[in-house]
């Protein structure tokens, strides 16, 4: 598996979720299964089957998060030069087809939130922009077709991961 770039915030978020699953959720679901098992016939015990399904989900999530952590590449974007688009860059782009401006910050996949302008480094937009410079024209394949953009600015600003 490839390295997964992320900020320290993203890494800490994943580690906290993994800890919660291992130390709280997993023991709780084991108790729920034991309680449900005590309710009799397991073939028709909906509570037992629901708890077992939840346990499978928790265990799968633990495996996924453990893989992400094992492959994490924590990057401090504040120390990178942002003369070209890279991880942690905030990019202001102009859609040349409709003259609309957009601003995006490139983050790790676990940190992305397009509604806040935080796009994953693996997204089609980010892939098209990474390595480009201010003033470059870029064609980006979007869901509604290809659009042409101009990079107006590239800079670093502290990333706001406000979780509210």
From Swiss-Prot:
Origin: domain of life: Bacteria
One Pfam match: GreA_GreB
* Signal sequence, start to end: none
What's this protein's family per the entry?
Belongs to the GreA/GreB family.
Q: Which GO terms describe its molecular function?
A: DNA binding; RNA polymerase binding
PROSITE patterns per record? GREAB_1, GREAB_2
- InterPro entries per record: GreA/GreB_C_sf, TF_GreA/GreB_CS, Tscrpt_elong_fac_GreA, Tscrpt_elong_fac_GreA/B, Tscrpt_elong_fac_GreA/B_C, Tscrpt_elong_fac_GreA/B_fam, Tscrpt_elong_fac_GreA/B_N, Tscrpt_elong_fac_GreA/B_N_sf
Alphabetized, the UniProt keywords read: DNA-binding, Transcription, Transcription regulation
A Gene Ontology biological process noted in the UniProt record is: regulation of DNA-templated transcription elongation
What is the source species?
Helicobacter pylori (strain Shi470)
Q: What is this protein's function per UniProt?
A: Necessary for efficient RNA polymerase transcription elongation past template-encoded arresting sites. The arresting sites in DNA have the property of trapping a certain fraction of elongating RNA polymerases that pass through, resulting in locked ternary complexes. Cleavage of the nascent transcript by cleavage factors such as GreA or GreB allows the resumption of elongation from the new 3'terminus. GreA releases sequences of 2 to 3 nucleotides.
Q: What is the recorded name of this protein? A: Transcription elongation factor GreA
């Amino acid at each position: 598996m490839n390295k997964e770039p992320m900020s320290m915030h993203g890494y800490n978020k994943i580690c906290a979720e993994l800890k919660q699953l291992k130390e709280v959720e997993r023991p709780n679901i084991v108790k729920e299964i034991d309680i449900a098992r005590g309710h009799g016939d397991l073939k028709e015990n909906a509570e037992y089957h629901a708890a077992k399904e939840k346990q499978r989900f928790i265990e799968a999530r633990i495996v996924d998060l453990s893989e992400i952590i094992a492959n994490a590449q924590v990057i401090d974007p504040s120390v990178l030069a942002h003369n070209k688009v890279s991880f942690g860059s905030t990019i202001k782009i102009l859609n040349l087809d409709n003259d609309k401006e957009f601003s995006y910050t490139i983050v790790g996949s676990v940190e992305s939130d397009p509604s806040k302008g935080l796009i994953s480094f693996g997204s089609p937009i980010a892939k098209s922009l990474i390595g480009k410079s201010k003033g470059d024209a870029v064609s980006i394949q979007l869901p509604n077709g290809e659009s042409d953009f101009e990079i107006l600015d590239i800079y670093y600003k502290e990333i706001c991961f406000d979780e509210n």
